[in-house]
Amino acid sequence: MQISLPALLSQLLLGLVNGSFYAILSLGLAVIFGLLNVINFAHGALFMMGAILSWMAMNYFGISYWVMLVAAPVIVGVFGVLIERLLLRWIYKLDHLYGLLLTLGLTLLIEGAFRSVYGVSGLGYDTPELLEGATDVGFMMLPNYRAWVVVASLVVCFATWYLIEKTRLGAYLRAGTENPRLVEAFGINVPLMVTLTYGFGVALAAFAGVLAAPVIQVTPLMGQNLIIVVFAVVVIGGMGSIMGSILTGLGLGIVEGLTKVFYPEASSTVVFLIMVVVLLVRPAGLFGKET
């Protein structure tokens, strides 16, 4: 089978775009699990919530994409803070299954609420005028918006990694997870820190949702299929591993894109095949710590 270079690079770019979404979403999951020890199944619904809030703001109030790129994560982050304070705080000392079931229930409620208003049909979201069109880079036409998605995702992902792994605040977050009493002895409000961490994690999902709105059809169910893949990404990278989630998300997006070129029939399952192999060889994940 002969594949032209532009076609190959186009699929590679598409894989990188999908990988960017995987990276941001899996990063949010890793932050929440690594620091709060909660499996947040509502992540896909909150990703969708960010996209639909952006669509609503644009269509009902004329608020631009750029404003919602900041506003939607803030709104969803505040919603996440309420979820953590009212619901999640009661299950931290229980088995992971309780958190999974609780967030699954939240997913059904959130998706059901939006589906009752908008149905399941796609909602059109125009590409921002500034990023319309494509740039000729010689060997292919590079869509401006897709290039923006990759750049924005990389900046957000590595800024988050730096914040958690290289700053004093990140050190407090990690220490608060392992020994909250010791951190509280230094005057740090650990419960507030935990609440804000969950809010930040779901804000990342909303940010990814706004980024995805012009690329992926906006529907109340848009997070369902994506979140299954993202959970696989987190497992492959290592539960709670920040850098593992970023690199694995980007890498698997590229692998998925190339699989669509050379063996399209396996493109929807290749991530899960890799997950099975990784779990057999290294159960803690590629970047996870063996216990």
What is each model feature region?
Residues 7, 86, 117, 178-185, ...:
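Cytosolic-side transmembrane-helix boundaries in multi-pass membrane proteins
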Residues 90-166, 193-196, 217, 258, ...:
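Transmembrane helix-bundle core of multi-pass membrane transporters
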